[in-house]
Swiss-Prot record:
It holds the Pfam family Phospholip_A2_1. It comes from Agkistrodon piscivorus leucostoma. Monomer. Inhibited by divalent cations different from calcium ions (cadmium, magnesium, manganese, zinc), since they act as competitive antagonists of this cofactor. One of its GO terms (biological process) is negative regulation of T cell proliferation. Optimum temperature is 37 degrees Celsius. One of its GO terms (cellular component) is extracellular region. InterPro entries: PLipase_A2, PLipase_A2_Asp_AS, PLipase_A2_dom, PLipase_A2_dom_sf, PLipase_A2_His_AS. The keyword Secreted applies. Its cofactor is Ca(2+). This is Acidic phospholipase A2 AplTX-I. It is an enzyme of class 3 (hydrolase). Gene3D superfamilies: Phospholipase A2 domain. Disulfide bonds join 42-131, 44-60, 59-111, 65-138, 66-104, 73-97, 91-102.
Length: 138
């Protein structure tokens, strides 16, 4: 029961529709976003500041920027629709705003997949005090 409580608390600290984003990461990058990317570098996880530490952290920086450009819906709360066609994730639905959220999540999952080799354990649970440099613009 304690484990379930801990997982519920962790779920509250991740932006977006967590289950959809987690599912996309699993489908595309073939690893758990919750485990690998929820507390990595300066941008993977809740919030973000400073300079991205590597290509994987940059995936999260770009994802944050993408969410920041979404208008007309809430990327942190709204769900979207997608399908898998010929092995590729295709964002769909009639709501262009929700489709944009899906595209942000899809691009991040592809970025994680394409940058698996840059993942460095030294950035997992990276101390926030190491993220004090001025952030670059989106």
């Amino acid at each position: 029961m304690r484990t379930l409580w801990i997982m519920a608390v962790l779920l509250l600290g991740v932006e977006g529709d967590l289950m959809q984003f987690e599912t996309l990461i699993m489908k595309i990058a073939k690893r758990s976003g919750m485990f690998w990317y929820s507390a990595y570098g300066c941008y993977c996880g809740w919030g973000g500041q400073g300079r991205p530490q590597d290509a994987t952290d940059r995936c999260c920086f770009v994802h944050d920027c993408c969410y920041g450009k979404v208008t007309g819906c809430d990327p942190k709360l709204d769900s979207y629709t997608y399908s898998v066609e010929n092995g590729d994730v295709v964002c769909g639905g009639n709501d262009p705003c929700k489709k944009e959220i899906c595209e942000c999540d899809r691009a991040a999952a592809i970025c994680f997949r394409d940058n698996k080799v840059t993942y460095d354990n030294k950035y997992w649970r990276f101390p926030p005090q190491n993220c004090k440099e001025e952030s670059e613009p989106c």
